Amino acid sequence: MKKIVNRLIQCILTLFIVSVLCFALTKAAPGDPVLTYVEPNMSEEYIQNLRESLGLTKPLYEQYFLWLGRILHGNFGNSLMNNRPVLTQMLERLPATVILMGTSMLLGFLIAIVLGLYSGKNKNGILDKITSLFCYVGISIPTFWFGIMLIYLFSVHLHILPSIGMHSDGNRSFGDLVLHMVMPCAVLTFANASQYIRYLRSSTITEMSSDYVMVQKAYGMKESGILFHHVLKNAMLPMITVLGMSLQSLVSGAIITEQVFAWPGIGQLAVTAVMQYDYPLIMGITMFTALLVVLGNLLADILYAVFDPRIRKAGC
């Protein structure tokens, strides 16, 4: 319980620091959001009144605390592009991002279990070397380049997969959704699996050299039984933390991937907001994604404590 309380305090401090950095960097960015969205022939008086109505003439510290207070009440402000509530736009885009990120994380995790487990069991074998090459390539290749190559091969050259969007015009079927997901999901899955495999392989190698494995082998227990019933269970514990830590890279990868494939998620909305100097939307998306990442890490810590008795005892 004490450990959870400490983590909650850390989460609050993290979000506070993120809010300060987000506000400061946005204010320090070049360009005037007001001049971006007014007609060139508008009078200086009108522009000044607009700045006052948006609260941009107040001291920076006052602007920050007013903005923070609104966020704490669930009010992220209105977008400068369309004057719609920022929170409404994010919630509209959230399902598409969750579908893409959740599917890629699940597939990457399943691939990691198979390849990481057998790679760790057969250390320095042919499968281990092939898997290591797979991981190095997956970590090294930029997601945008991999996405563009997939579009060129499967959309431009072979014409077998759609390259943009979440659905075809007039087609909202599940099969159409799956076809649109194949390439963006493959990009994120490749990157995720490459990270997960390395950690699971390392944990498997450590567990395979443990005393309890030697004892079970001495008792004549089959190696496959030891691997799946004992080694996998213990090797999976560090993966809980890894999954929480990978949320940051998954979110950043999703932003790029959504833009490449025109996937209508929060990532694409974020890029549009940056290109249009829509500061309320930029700050809202930043805080919203930071909250999701922090909560994901907190959940990973809680699950780790639930499944590992040593952590529970240490936190008492």
Region spans (language model):
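Cytoplasmic-entry segments and transmembrane alpha-helices of multi-pass inner-membrane transporters
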Residues: 1-9, 114-150, 237-239
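Alpha-helical transmembrane segments of integral membrane proteins
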Residues: 2, 90-127, 172-316
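Residue-level recognition of pore/gate-forming positions within transmembrane alpha-helices
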Residues: 11, 41, 109, 136, ...
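Membrane-embedded alpha-helical segments of multi-pass transporters/permeases
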Residues: 15, 19, 23-28, 144, ...
